[in-house]
Amino acid sequence: MIVKAEIGNQDPIYIEANKYAHQADSSILISQGGTKVLVTVCVSEEPLCGIDFAPLSVDYRERSFAWGKIPGGFIKREGKPTDREVLISRVIDRPLRPLMPKGFLNEVVVTCLTLSADDKYDPDVLAITGASAALVSSSVPFEGPIAGMRVCRVNGEFIINPTYEQRKNSDMDIVMALSKDAIVMVEGGAKEVEESVLLDALFFGLEKGQTLIKAQEELVDSLKPEKKPIGHIGLSDDMANKLKEIASSKILEAFSIEDKKERSKALKDVYAQAMQKLGISKEQEFDFLVSFKDLESQLMREQILKYKKRIDGRKETDIRPITIEMHPLERPHGSAVFTRGQTQALATVTLAPKDEAQLVETIFEGETFKRFMLHYNFPPFSTGEARPWGPPRRREIGHGALAERALEPLLAKEEDFPYIIRVVSDILESNGSSSMATVCAGSLALFDAGVPMKKHVAGIAMGLIKDGDNFVILTDILGDEDHLGDMDFKVAGTRDGVTSVQMDIKIKGLSKDIMIKALNQAKEARMFILDKLYEAIPEPNKEVSKYAPKAQVMKIPEDKVGLVIGPAGKNIKYIKEQFGASVWIDGANAYINAPTIEAVNKAADFINSLIQEVEVGGVYEGKVIRVENYGLFVEVLPGKVGLLHASAMTEKPTINVGDTIKVKVMAIDEQNRLNLCSPDYQKPENQERPRKEQLNRKPHHRK
């Protein structure tokens, strides 16, 4: 069964069911142009016990053969998932999870495998649509379909699922997931676009993406898959009502405690007391836990919707108290601590030479070097957990990418600031919105490090409580508001526009009115936080840290690049050995790095001497490299040797190889050979020019 969807002016998308992988519960081959992604769904026979969340896992993988490459590195096969694969797995997972019905506890595994990738269409959005198509055609009672779309803007015009070339010229790159009538997920970056433009882009995508929804509905109508039953979790209605009578007032008392740790302890006490009063057995404990969490959510939502009262007593638009500590650490090249309520981020900046850039392999560009990196760490102690600290999890990689995307558009060009930049954010304490605290702390630390950022960047997380047509948008959400609410909408940017956005929801979609209010409220909050950042450090420091390496970039004429490098890298090695400076040639740019500015200047002077042209009439201090009876061979610039004939010397002292003398360039002949003389030499008017065979008995060559 194959269905087709037309998407704007791009190649059509084809969705083919059950062509491959027949042992899976369902499989979809989705393609656009030369890009093909195989998506499979596998479902366990029996539901899992003791969990209150959808046991869904999503894995996205790319094979190097998909774009005709062999994996780089010593081992020529794919290994653990790359950051790109992790990020795409998250983008697929996030819109699917809210549409898994509560009570369906069978384990569901969605696997997306890119089999072919052309140089036009990114497989990530195809994988989102393919995953939805695989689920609606499987035995999973998935409440879809949804579709994945990419929206860009080129020269003021929105483009759906743009090609790679179009994306390079775009001022925004937004991946979104949509249902039949609403937006369900947003992820993307922009170059300071206004909120109204972002909103227009999203609803343009919602309109154009309906062809993919209709194609999946056509697929389901044809296949008519049989769905597995949905179970019930939680206490019976009678027991749930008794729990509400016993625990409601005490839960509300606990909610009034501002401190997260104390509030959590109070809720645990209420939980234990209610469990004892109701006589809950060990076998009933899981159902009791589910109902207790449902009651917490219900009470919190009622307090906000009816009384506009939040857990910590704030109003819906209030931001928690903000404190900033600049340069708390001496040796890192830049550092800052940003604290908002009980969320605290320590950001540090490290500057490094170009040869320390991160090598990455991408579908469209092959091997490239990444200049700016932001790594986000979420240690267990940030939430008071007693567990070992392992390698970065998917969430940490995702939050780091979100913050990196927010800050990167404001960095100076590499030609103006020739450093590799690494920002590390360690979350020291967390109670909601640690990724947006990372954006703020990262901006402060970059200013502290002397990175010439164009502007400060700040971020804020927005929440939503919705019941029918009644809704409240919350600014600067707590962890509990994120957990028990309907939306986590993160927006980062400058005073002039949005640079990064991420939205996840737990309901089936958001209306345009909600999106407008959320973006406008987020803008007000962002302006407030930006004022705090500018108060702390109004502009980047003029100089980098004394502990940072020193750097300079030089423009090299294209025809001189080989001369600068030298045979087998001779000149680059000489600069390293002689001055302690490293040189990286990239196109027509030479990037010089050294521990001191003196070493950088010496290396730059040497490179200038290599590319400098010898001028007739110019006086140079040269090095004698050969002595003959008829004159001296003098190197006036590296690689440029001329003859100082005995007849052109005003004095004839004893000179040895290695001595330095001042010489003047009399002439450059048609073979680019240099004729030299003493600086004060005056050629007699009637003196004949020395014969060529006298001047040049031996061929000149570079030493």
From Swiss-Prot:
It is an enzyme of class 2 (transferase). InterPro entries: ExoRNase_PH_dom1 (IPR001247), ExoRNase_PH_dom2 (IPR015847), ExoRNase_PH_dom2_sf (IPR036345), KH_dom (IPR004087), KH_dom_type_1 (IPR004088), KH_dom_type_1_sf (IPR036612), NA-bd_OB-fold (IPR012340), PNPase (IPR012162). Its EC number is 2.7.7.8. Keywords: Cytoplasm, Magnesium, Metal-binding, Nucleotidyltransferase, RNA-binding, Transferase. GO terms for cellular component: cytosol. Residues 617-679 form the S1 motif domain. One of its GO terms (biological process) is mRNA catabolic process. One of its GO terms (molecular function) is polyribonucleotide nucleotidyltransferase activity. Residues 549-607 form the KH domain. Its main location: cytoplasm. Its cofactor is Mg(2+). It catalyses: RNA(n+1) + phosphate = RNA(n) + a ribonucleoside 5'-diphosphate. The keyword Lipid metabolism does not apply. Residues 677-703 are annotated as: Disordered. The keyword tRNA-binding does not apply. HAMAP family: PNPase. Belongs to the polyribonucleotide nucleotidyltransferase family. PANTHER family: POLYRIBONUCLEOTIDE NUCLEOTIDYLTRANSFERASE, POLYRIBONUCLEOTIDE NUCLEOTIDYLTRANSFERASE 1, MITOCHONDRIAL. This is Polyribonucleotide nucleotidyltransferase. The gene is pnp.
